[in-house]
């Protein structure tokens, strides 16, 4: 130990050297007044090396830990020609067991390369979901494959409710026994209907029913008289209209192109009444009707 009661004086240089040699701990504290920081742990570079080493070990560990199952014949594997792999049963079942599914990062990196080890002949036909249809979704979500099957079922139901697509191709209408009607009978029936519609209370019609639908409506109106004594309508042909009858009686030549029309009266009575009726119709056309007070001579 160093004692302060030495006889050496502090003023000499030699005495200072002797004192420093006797007390080495005192020199560390007085070495420029700096304190050395103690070491607290590994540095950043060492920590980075340790992290990279652990990551490299974790990537190589699944290939050594998980051994492939034995190739013993299980009841789920069916007899097939060629090599049979144990994964084919899981593909057909639609799900993998939990021990065969690798961790998430490894599965994301290696799922493309792992497909090359499986033969294409043992793979079943993939549906619309592709490879990911065999992975079970979480409990809070539903698989997209279920949505596809529901959509197909709804299409079948809707197509069953709409049978007209198939009726156009397969259904044939049943044709019953048809009756043929001669053309002459149709014409006489249409004449009867026209006469019934156009016969007035006085027994006269407005104009010739044969020329009702004809486009040449410029000809003057003619009269047809109904004979109530006859049970069935008997048509008599008249040679000319009112103007041609007047021309014949006056001695002038009438044209040869005759337009026939029909009447219910015999020929003798028809000629007598045509003379009186032709003048009366001309005058009535321009007279006023006293019942309604309408002047027919006014033209719009």
Curated annotation (Swiss-Prot):
A motif (EAR) lies at residues 294-300. InterPro entries: SPEAR. GO terms for biological process: leaf development; negative regulation of DNA-templated transcription. A motif (SPL) lies at residues 40-48. Residues 1-10 have a biased composition (Polar residues). GO terms for molecular function: DNA-binding transcription factor activity. Residues 25-39 have a biased composition (Basic residues). Keywords: Repressor, Transcription, Transcription regulation. Residues 1-45 are annotated as: Disordered. The keyword Hydrolase does not apply. Coiled coil: none annotated. Interacts with SPL and SPEAR2. Adapter-like transcriptional repressor recruiting TPL/TPR coepressors to inhibit TCP transcription factors. May be involved in leaf development. Knock down expression of SPEAR2/TIE4 and SPEAR4/TIE3 by RNAi in a SPEAR3/TIE1 null mutant produces lines displaying epinastic leaves. This is Protein SPEAR4. It comes from Arabidopsis thaliana (Mouse-ear cress). The gene is SPEAR4.
């Amino acid at each position: 130990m160093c004692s302060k009661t030495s006889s050496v004086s502090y003023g000499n240089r030699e005495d200072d050297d002797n004192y420093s040699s006797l007390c080495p701990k005192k020199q560390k504290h007085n070495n420029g007044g700096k304190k050395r920081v103690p070491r607290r742990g590994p540095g950043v570079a060492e920590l980075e090396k340790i992290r990279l080493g652990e990551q490299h070990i974790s990537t190589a560990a699944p290939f050594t830990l998980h051994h492939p199952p034995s190739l013993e014949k299980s009841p789920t594997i069916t007899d097939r020609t060629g090599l049979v792999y144990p994964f084919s049963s899981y593909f057909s079942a639609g799900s993998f067991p939990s021990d065969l599914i690798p961790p998430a990062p490894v599965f994301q990196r290696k799922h493309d390369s792992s497909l090359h080890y499986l033969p294409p002949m043992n793979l079943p036909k993939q549906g619309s979901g592709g490879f990911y249809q065999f992975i079970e979704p979480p409990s809070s979500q539903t698989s997209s494959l279920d949505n596809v099957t529901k959509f197909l079922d709804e299409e079948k139901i809707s197509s069953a409710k709409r049978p007209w697509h198939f009726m156009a191709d397969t259904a044939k209408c049943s044709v019953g026994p048809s009756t043929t009607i001669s053309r002459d009978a149709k014409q006489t029936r249409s004449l009867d209907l026209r006469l019934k519609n156009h016969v007035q209370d006085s027994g006269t019609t407005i104009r010739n029913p044969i020329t009702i639908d004809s486009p040449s409506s410029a000809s003057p109106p003619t009269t047809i008289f109904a004979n109530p004594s006859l049970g069935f309508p008997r048509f008599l042909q008249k040679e000319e209209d009112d103007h041609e009858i007047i021309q014949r009686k006056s001695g002038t030549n009438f044209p040869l192109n005759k337009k026939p029309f029909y009447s219910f009266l015999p020929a003798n009575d028809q000629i007598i009444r045509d003379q009186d009726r032709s003048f009366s119709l001309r005058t009535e056309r321009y007279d006023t009707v006293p019942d309604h007070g309408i002047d027919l001579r006014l033209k719009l």
